[in-house]
Amino acid sequence: MASQTIPKLKSVLYCDVCTLPVEYCEFEGTLKKCKEWLKSSHPDVYDKLYGEQDLSKDLENTLNVSGTKDSNAEEQPAKLTKEEKRVEREEAKRMASKVLIKTIERTKRKRVTTVQGLDAFGIETKKAAKMLANKFATGASVTKTADKKDEIVVQGDLNYDIFDFILEKFKEVPEDNIKIVEDTKSKKKQ
């Protein structure tokens, strides 16, 4: 056997904003944020990828068609693309939504726990119901509420257990967005 040269592995730099290689950031909807991150974290790579483009854009912004300097060009903020606006709206909507965990009393001493709002975070409610049923060895189903939203109904009083389960299994749901609603019905005095 002749001496074989083993090729070295290439090191790929991934963007912290969109999690793609930095060469592909332009295909994601967050190019402006990706450029800002790359410029602050890896200025040499930023100059290699976007250095000439930024210079030409700066020249276009500072000089208008007649060649005179435009004072408003520097003051105007860069407009977000439709994709970036859509992504920001979805993120804001997702962060504003809440997951409600509520226990409802049924006949005699039986209780059911309902979980609403998981679908706002991109979690499939049927799969979540199946996971809850397996975890707590109880019945769980997906039903539609009066306002046409999915809710998971789990048999048993499992408020805090489900709270911990959601934090453990579904990392995309922040702890601040999970709310346990206590059912405080006054019982009849006998």
From Swiss-Prot:
Its main location: cytoplasm. GO terms for biological process: formation of translation preinitiation complex; translation reinitiation. InterPro entries: DENR/SUI1_TIF, DENR_C, DENR_eukaryotes, DENR_N, SUI1, SUI1_dom_sf. It is found in: Cytoplasm. Residues 63-83 are annotated as: Disordered. Keywords: Cytoplasm. Gene3D superfamilies: SUI1-like domain (3.30.780.10). One of its GO terms (molecular function) is translation initiation factor activity. The keyword Cytoplasm applies. It comes from the Eukaryota. Disulfide bonds: none annotated. Pfam families: DENR_N, SUI1. Residues 99-170 form the SUI1 domain. One of its GO terms (cellular component) is cytosol. The keyword Cytoplasm applies. Interacts with the 40S ribosomal subunit. The SUI1 domain may be involved in RNA binding. PANTHER family: DENSITY-REGULATED PROTEIN, DENSITY-REGULATED PROTEIN HOMOLOG. Belongs to the DENR family. This is Translation machinery-associated protein 22. It comes from Schizosaccharomyces pombe (strain 972 / ATCC 24843).
